[in-house]
Amino acid sequence: MDSDSKEAAAVIERAMSSVPLSMKVYAPDGNYPEGYNYWGYGTSFNVMLIAALESALGSDGGLSAVEGFMSSARFMQYMAGTTGLAFNFSDARETTQSFPAMFWYASKLGDPSLLWNEKIFLTREDTHFTAEEERFLPIILIYGSRFDMKEVTPPVSKIWTGHGKVPVALIRTGWDKGEGFYVGIKGGTASANHAHMDAGSFVFEAQGVRWAQDLGMQEYYSLEKEGVRL
């Protein structure tokens, strides 16, 4: 594409007109209807597109200003409980992971507290990455170099709420692992992408234990082999 400026321009223009359509899911507050894991998948590519446009063209064409997109980083931070498990509504698993896109958000917003969960995850002895996750790691090198991780402190806030197609309320009494209480509850509809019939489901954690949990996802193949058309 770098040898054909007309073709490159056409692709970029089409992206600039179509990508905002998919970004409407972040409105109004940033809670992502598809849940924990799919936030990492979709938002990471969204961040890379914005970063590439800013680097190459000097502007992202307003993509980062789409309603709810920048607020979504804080939503994602709250989705990890004090046990180290995720609020796994919709097609999501309990296991938490690092999201390199958070380093871009922290840099863009000038808010290193967004990296608190990343700091915890990246310093764990059992930290590992799948091949799918490894492809995003360069984002940490690029944007993480702008922060002294030793000085990253937890957010001051303890409550996060979001409206929209799948509204959520996420409440905690502390940010250190095993500290205090954590409650996550969701509303919404089963018609959202990757949604379950789980409106009203919640997780509750206290003293480092998850006492109430969402059943989470069922592996797709186990359904497809029984003739369920997903």
For every predicted segment, state its role.
Residues 1-37, 140-157:
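Active-site lining segments of carbohydrate-active enzymes
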Residues 212, 218-230:
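C-terminal, non-catalytic macromolecule-binding modules
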Residues 41-215:
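Carbohydrate-active enzyme catalytic cores, enriched for enzymes
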Residues 34, 89-91, 222:
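Generic structural "secondary-structure junction" signal
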Residues 33, 38, 211, 219:
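Short, flexible micro-motifs
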Residues 29, 34, 207, 215, ...:
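Short glycine-rich loop/turn motifs that provide flexible caps or phosphate-binding loops at active sites
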